[in-house]
């Protein structure tokens, strides 16, 4: 038998499919693209273009950089498909890609610039990833162990617009008609509670989160004129007693921050707090059951290694299991944000 016949198919090379380093180089240099995108947001390049300052010279003057650097940045943004250009001429006009126009122009009601910049402060820590994996300093809450009010304010300034979008999606996906009290675990800015109580008359909500976060949550609740519907409870939901008699529990976008034992603990507490017939919705970054992806969930799990929590990525089947073990029935995985978030829900028997 020839060597080629013995080799695994994935390792067999032909002249047409010869292995090279292109894929690996692209990964190694991916932070260059991140830096270009973040610089464009910080400099308000996309906003300048949307307002008609759409040539290299006009962008340079508007955002306060040299024409040479404007040319460098705009060329990269075109290659990244964030911008289009009319022609190859030096005085070509540029235009924003549709998603850029919607989410990265400052006067858009869906402006997500702070979310794009959300992970920038983590760059230095990721540069130390191998060392942090070798010598972890483990804390249950990881990066949130020493969270301050100012940390919470910066965090939710970055995540609020995305959180409100997810909250609107939740309230479109789930019928909470007739429900009276929702417990929002790790509810952050209160987005899910604000939108749900606005959507479903008669529903009130409690946002349970760390003490510094609830200070900031109150600011968002007041800004949305929801203080008569949404209150806060300061605490750590792995330790703090839950209010009883709730008929909806939501835990959203904090799944990878916790290890299985803590998720089981929290889900068990939620089950005990719910009235018979009540429901729980756990929304998070979940792995497929074959553990091959999606990448987003895998990276959020890795992120916990960077910041020293005990959390990791969970599969959809594992999350279903946490609810079923607690006693929930009819547990099912529902699509939420494909490739990013799943919604796992179940009901307490009546």
Locate the predicted segments by residue.
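Conserved Class I S-adenosyl-L-methionine-dependent methyltransferase catalytic core
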Residues: 10-14, 21-43, 47-53, 61-62, ...
């Amino acid at each position: 038998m020839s060597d080629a016949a013995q080799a695994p198919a994935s390792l067999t090379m032909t002249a047409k499919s010869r292995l090279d380093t292109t894929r690996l180089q692209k990964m190694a240099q991916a932070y260059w693209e991140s830096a270009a995108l973040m610089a464009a947001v910080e400099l308000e390049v996309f906003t300048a273009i949307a307002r008609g300052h759409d040539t290299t010279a006009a962008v340079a003057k508007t955002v306060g950089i040299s024409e040479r650097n404007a040319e460098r940045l705009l060329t990269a943004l075109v290659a990244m498909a964030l911008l289009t250009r009319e022609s190859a001429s030096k005085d070509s006009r540029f235009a924003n890609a549709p998603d850029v126009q919607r989410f990265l122009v400052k006067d858009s009601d869906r402006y997500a610039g702070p979310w794009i910049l959300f992970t920038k402060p983590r760059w230095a820590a990721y540069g130390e990833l191998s060392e942090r994996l070798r010598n972890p300093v483990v804390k249950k809450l990881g990066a949130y162990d020493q969270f301050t009010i100012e940390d919470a304010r910066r965090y939710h300034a970055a995540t609020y617009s995305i959180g409100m979008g997810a909250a609107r999606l939740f309230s479109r996906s789930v019928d909470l008609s007739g429900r009276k009290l929702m417990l929002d675990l790790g509810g952050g800015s209160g987005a899910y509670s604000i939108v749900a109580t606005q959507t479903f008359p008669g529903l009130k909500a409690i946002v349970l989160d760390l003490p510094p976060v609830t200070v900031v949550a109150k600011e968002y609740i007041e800004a949305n004129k929801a203080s008569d519907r949404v209150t806060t409870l300061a605490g750590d939901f792995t330790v703090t007693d839950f209010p009883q008699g709730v008929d909806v529990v939501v835990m959203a976008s904090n799944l990878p921050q916790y290890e299985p034992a803590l998720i089981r603990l929290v889900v068990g507490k939620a089950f005990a707090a719910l009235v018979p017939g009540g429901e729980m919705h756990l929304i998070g970054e979940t792995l497929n059951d074959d553990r091959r992806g999606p990448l987003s969930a895998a990276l959020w799990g890795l992120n916990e290694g960077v910041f020293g929590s005990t959390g990791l990525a969970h599969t959809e089947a594992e999350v279903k299991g946490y609810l079923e073990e607690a006693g929930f029935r009819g547990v099912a995985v529902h699509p939420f944000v494909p490739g990013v978030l799943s919604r796992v829900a179940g009901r307490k028997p009546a």
